[in-house]
Amino acid sequence: QTWPPVEGRPSCKRCGACTRMWPPEANRCVCDDIVPQCHEGCSKCEKVDTRSGKPLYQCQSFEYYNCAA
């Protein structure tokens, strides 16, 4: 089975829950980052209520990310 190369994945500063696959490159995670716009491949983008007044979003589906170490 193949998966996307790490370099081509959306970046995520705070990866939350992840699958436990081997090798590690096969893992998919939920990104806990709150951003102005979800990445193109996100299949479940949810609006997050914040006090800033600006619309912010979080991708809540398991996706392939380039997680910050």
Curated annotation (Swiss-Prot):
One Gene Ontology term, aspect cellular component: extracellular region
Entries under Gene3D superfamilies matching the protein: Cysteine Protease (Bromelain) Inhibitor, subunit H (2.10.69.10)
SUPFAM superfamilies: Bowman-Birk inhibitor, BBI
InterPro entries: Bowman-Birk_prot_inh, Prot_inh_BBI
Pfam families, per database record: Bowman-Birk_leg
Source superkingdom: Eukaryota
Alphabetical keyword list: Disulfide bond, Protease inhibitor, Serine protease inhibitor
Disulphide bond pairs: 12-31, 18-29, 38-45, 42-59
Function in brief: Serine protease inhibitor.
Similarity comment: Belongs to the Bowman-Birk serine protease inhibitor family.
Protein name: Bowman-Birk type proteinase inhibitor A2
